[in-house]
């Protein structure tokens, strides 16, 4: 009874069970918010929650990769996890803890925190993708 989360920016539900994901950085113009894979950022980290324990797996490889989280049906095996990378080594880190927070803290200890810039840097930010779709974009 595992529940999978993570993988960075992905379309669809936050719970990733029963799906196969392609992970590579891609400018997915006009993507479908329910089903498009891949999107702009990928983080090859899954956080798994069970009733009694949480654990995370970080695949330390940023080449294009695929992760199956129970999508493939097999007559001989129950649902399973499968990771495949286009290139590079298979270095991975396993984090365990009672709570999701414990696993997240362990992952952050390895990868580092996101640092926020100074308040003055948080000025106006606009997206040109939105502007080009506007009927008055040329005005």
What do the predicted segments below correspond to?
Residues 1-119, 127-130:
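Catalytic and substrate-binding clefts that recognize carbohydrates or anionic sugar/phosphate headgroups
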Residues 133-139:
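Short, acidic/polar
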């Amino acid at each position: 009874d595992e529940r999978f989360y993570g993988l960075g920016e992905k379309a669809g539900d936050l719970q990733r069970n029963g799906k196969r994901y392609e992970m590579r950085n891609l400018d997915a113009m006009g993507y479908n918010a329910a089903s498009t894979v891949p999107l702009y950022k990928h983080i090859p980290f899954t956080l798994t929650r069970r009733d009694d324990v949480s654990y995370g797996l970080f695949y330390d490889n940023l080449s294009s990769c695929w992760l199956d989280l129970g999508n493939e049906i097999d007559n001989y095996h129950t649902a399973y996890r499968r990771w495949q990378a286009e290139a590079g080594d298979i270095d991975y880190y396993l984090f365990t803890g009672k709570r999701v927070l414990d696993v997240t803290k362990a992952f952050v200890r390895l990868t580092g925190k996101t640092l926020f810039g100074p308040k003055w840097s948080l000025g106006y930010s606009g997206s040109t993708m939105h502007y080009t779709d506007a009927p008055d974009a040329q005005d």
